C-alpha cells in the first residue's frame, strides 16, 4: 500500500479478510467503502464458529471513517454487518429483496453470458453481461452499487458493465454434445475442474 501511495495511487479495491480485520492488520488503512458479498463455511479452523467468523467480518462496517456500505441484501447476515454502521454511513443493497437499491426482477442465462432486468432508483434497466455464472451478476451488481454510491451515473455504469469480458484463467463454457446442460470449466495448474452451472462450485 505504501508503494502504491508513492506512485500516486489514490483509490484501491482490496479484500478485507476476516484474518486481517481480526488481527488489526488493516488499522492503518483508511477504508471509506465497505462491501459485503456473503459468508460461507470457510476459515472455521481459525475462527472456530460461523458466529465468530461473522463477527470478525462485521468489524469492517464499524470503522469510523466508513461513508458507504454496500451489501448483498439476500444474505441473512447483511443486517448483522450493517448493525455496527454509524449514522453517517450511506447504505445501499443489491439482490432480489424488494427493499434493495438494485433489484433483480428477471434473469436469463445464455451460453456465453446472461441478461437481467434490474429495478434501480432511476427506473428499470436491462443489464447484459458477457460473463457466465449467476455469481458474476451478483458481484457486478455490488460493484455497480459502489460506483453509483460514489456518484457515477447509472446509465454509464450499465453500459460499461456490458463490455466486461471473461478472464482467460476464469470460467469458460463447455457444451456436452450428448447433454443439454451447460457446464463450466476452470483450469488451475493444469487441473481441469468441472462444476454444475447451478452452483458454479468446483467438485
PLM regions: where:
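Acidic, Mg2+-coordinating active-site environments of NTP-dependent enzymes
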Residues: 6-14, 22, 31-181, 202
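AMP-binding/adenylate-forming catalytic core of the ANL superfamily
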Residues: 187-203
Amino acid at each position: 500500500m505504501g508503494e502504491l501511495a508513492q506512485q500516486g495511487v489514490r483509490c484501491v479495491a482490496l479484500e478485507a479478510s476476516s484474518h486481517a480485520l481480526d488481527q488489526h492488520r488493516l488499522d492503518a488503512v483508511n477504508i471509506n467503502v465497505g462491501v459485503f458479498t456473503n459468508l460461507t463455511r470457510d476459515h472455521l479452523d481459525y475462527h472456530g464458529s460461523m458466529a465468530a467468523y461473522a463477527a470478525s467480518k462485521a468489524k469492517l462496517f464499524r470503522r469510523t471513517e466508513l461513508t458507504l456500505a454496500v451489501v448483498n441484501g439476500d444474505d441473512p447476515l447483511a443486517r448483522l454487518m450493517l448493525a455496527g454502521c454509524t449514522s453517517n454511513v450511506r447504505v445501499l443493497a443489491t439482490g432480489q429483496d424488494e427493499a434493495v437499491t438494485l433489484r433483480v426482477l428477471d434473469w436469463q442465462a445464455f451460453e456465453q453470458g446472461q441478461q437481467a432486468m434490474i429495478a434501480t432508483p432511476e427506473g428499470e434497466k436491462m443489464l447484459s453481461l458477457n460473463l457466465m455464472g449467476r455469481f458474476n451478476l451478483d458481484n457486478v451488481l455490488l460493484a455497480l452499487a459502489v460506483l453509483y454510491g460514489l456518484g457515477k451515473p447509472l446509465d454509464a455504469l450499465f453500459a460499461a458493465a456490458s463490455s466486461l469480458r471473461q478472464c482467460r484463467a476464469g470460467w469458460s463454457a463447455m457444451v456436452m454434445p450428448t447433454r443439454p446442460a451447460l457446464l463450466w470449466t476452470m483450469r488451475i495448474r493444469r487441473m481441469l475442474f468441472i462444476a454444475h452451472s447451478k452452483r458454479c462450485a468446483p467438485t
